[in-house]
């Protein structure tokens, strides 16, 4: 067992990303062997389709309603241009780019934990635990998933602030927030780390880096005349048409998504709190991220298991912190051997059986049996169930008009639109719960060709 601990889990900082590479490849092979390739979720297909639409001459936010900040859609467009508009090549490149981001994120988690604890094995453990969560290693197979890039840039901004490299840190923080509204915590924390050095020069460089990325991301939107549409869909609509689920509903959903990983999650959170008490000055930002994650999940945004991403990162780091506490209290070699055995078993179980948890983040079962109709419930049905509206109270559209739109569009039709290179006749074709609620509040029609007009409920 000691040899296993020293060889398979050596002190090499590249061990975790190397292991994660093999895990991602296993997930890809699983999908290919099941005959499901190419496969997407409604979200990944939507991002990729918008990227292809812009490549084909359409405009962000105007020709396709979407609440994601611009960098998410612009990166999808870059991939569409690289693939020259071929949807199958675009999808493959999207999977590859997402996996690469996941591998780099694994390295970053491992490296930062090692740096904080001064224990490389603790860092290695954090990286391995991160990749054992099925939602992490399996979601990347479904195409372009922005969350991997969001947290790669976000965690990168914190790492660069700690070193410090203020221009790069500011740029990375802005890129993170430019892909997901709730990543705004990363500019706040990374700026806080920079500010503690009490250097005006560092602060100005940080602001400069952030400004450059903000300018680059907003310029295409401005040139397309989409700033108003972006403001409405990215900022105003989520404020008025956000989620309304109860605390208990969200808690049960979290338990459902985590299942067998609940003990690991609890241990990781305990590790974060213990580490914080040991070194408040060094680890305050970890607790800050944990508090923000709780606000996000229980109040602001928890649509699916991919919204647990930040929590999984923090739990993984917390496991490293917990190991550090154990290794200082007990004999290090014995602890290394025991932890290695547990982690290897957990890794094999989570990768081979996907934790035995079934569907997590996408409309396909892990067994490869095809679409799960319970997951493929249309956005209109979801909205009606959650809010109490009937099918025909959405916007100002008559029933026959709504029926015609629903028969061609919706969450379960996005994949077909993407792979057949189809341009929808309406800008409202995703028909997510938020989109439908916004349409109802502002009395928009299902057949509108252009979205993003300045409207308030």
Swiss-Prot record:
Main location: membrane
Enzyme Commission designation: 2.4.1.-
UniProt KW Nucleus keyword: no
Subcellular location: Cell membrane
Record's keyword terms, sorted: Cell membrane, Glycosyltransferase, Membrane, Transferase, Transmembrane, Transmembrane helix
Topology of this chain in the membrane: Multi-pass membrane protein
Phenotype caused by lack of the gene: Mutants lack the final mannose subunit of the N-linked pentasaccharide.
Extracellular side: 34-91, 142-173, 233-259, 305-307, 359-457
Pathway named in the protein's UniProt entry: Cell surface structure biogenesis; S-layer biogenesis; Protein modification; protein glycosylation
Classification via InterPro entries: AglS
One GO-annotated biological process of the protein: S-layer organization
GO cellular component annotations of the record: plasma membrane
GO molecular function, one term: dolichyl-phosphate-mannose-protein mannosyltransferase activity
Function statement: Involved in the assembly of a N-linked pentasaccharide that decorates the S-layer glycoprotein and flagellins. Transfers mannose, the terminal pentasaccharide residue, from its dedicated dolichol phosphate carrier to the protein-bound glycan comprising the first four subunits of the N-linked pentasaccharide.
Protein known as: Dolichol phosphate-mannose mannosyltransferase
Protein source organism: Haloferax volcanii (strain ATCC 29605 / DSM 3757 / JCM 8879 / NBRC 14742 / NCIMB 2012 / VKM B-1768 / DS2) (Halobacterium volcanii)
Gene: aglS
């Amino acid at each position: 067992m000691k040899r296993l601990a020293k060889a398979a889990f050596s002190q090499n900082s590249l061990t975790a990303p190397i292991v994660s590479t093999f895990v991602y490849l296993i997930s890809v092979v699983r999908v290919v062997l099941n005959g499901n390739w190419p496969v997407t979720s409604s979200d990944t297909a939507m991002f990729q389709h918008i990227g292809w639409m812009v490549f084909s001459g359409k405009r962000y936010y105007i020709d396709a309603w979407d609440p994601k900040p611009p960098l998410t859609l612009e990166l999808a467009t870059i991939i569409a241009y690289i693939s020259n508009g071929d949807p199958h090549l675009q999808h493959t490149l999207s999977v590859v780019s997402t996996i690469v981001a996941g591998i780099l994120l694994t390295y970053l988690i491992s490296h930062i934990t090692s740096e904080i604890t001064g224990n490389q094995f603790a860092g290695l453990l954090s990286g391995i635990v991160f990749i054992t969560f099925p939602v992490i290693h399996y979601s990347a197979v479904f195409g372009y998933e922005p969350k991997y890039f969001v947290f790669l840039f976000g965690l990168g901004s914190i790492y660069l602030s700690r070193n410090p490299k203020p221009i790069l840190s500011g740029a990375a923080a802005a890129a993170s927030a430019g892909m997901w509204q709730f990543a705004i915590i990363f500019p706040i924390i990374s700026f806080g780390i920079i500010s503690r050095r009490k250097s005006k020069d560092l602060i100005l460089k940080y602001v400069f880096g952030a400004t450059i990325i903000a300018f680059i991301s907003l310029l295409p939107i401005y040139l397309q005349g989409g700033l108003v549409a972006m403001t409405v869909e990215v900022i105003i609509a989520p404020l008025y048409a956000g989620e309304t689920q109860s605390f208990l509903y969200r808690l049960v959903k979290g338990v459902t998504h985590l299942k067998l990983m609940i003990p690991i999650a609890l241990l990781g959170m305990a590790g974060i709190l213990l580490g914080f008490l040991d070194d408040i000055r060094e680890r305050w930002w970890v607790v800050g991220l944990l508090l923000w994650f709780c606000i996000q999940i229980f109040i602001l945004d928890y649509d699916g298991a991919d919204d647990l991403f930040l929590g999984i990162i923090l739990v993984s780091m917390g496991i490293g912190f917990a190991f550090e506490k154990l290794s200082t209290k007990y004999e290090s070699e014995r602890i290394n051997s025991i932890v290695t055995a547990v982690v290897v078993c957990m890794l094999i179980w989570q990768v081979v059986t996907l934790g035995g948890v079934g569907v997590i983040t996408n409309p396909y079962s892990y067994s490869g049996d095809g679409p799960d109709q319970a997951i493929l419930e249309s956005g209109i049905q979801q909205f009606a169930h959650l809010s109490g509206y009937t099918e025909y109270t959405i916007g100002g559209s008559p029933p026959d008009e709504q029926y015609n739109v629903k028969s061609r569009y919706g969450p379960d039709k996005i994949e077909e639109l993407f792979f057949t290179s189809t341009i929808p006749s309406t800008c409202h074709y995703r028909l997510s719960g938020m989109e439908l609620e916004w349409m109802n509040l502002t009395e928009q029609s299902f057949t509108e060709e252009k979205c993003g007009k300045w409207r308030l409920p």
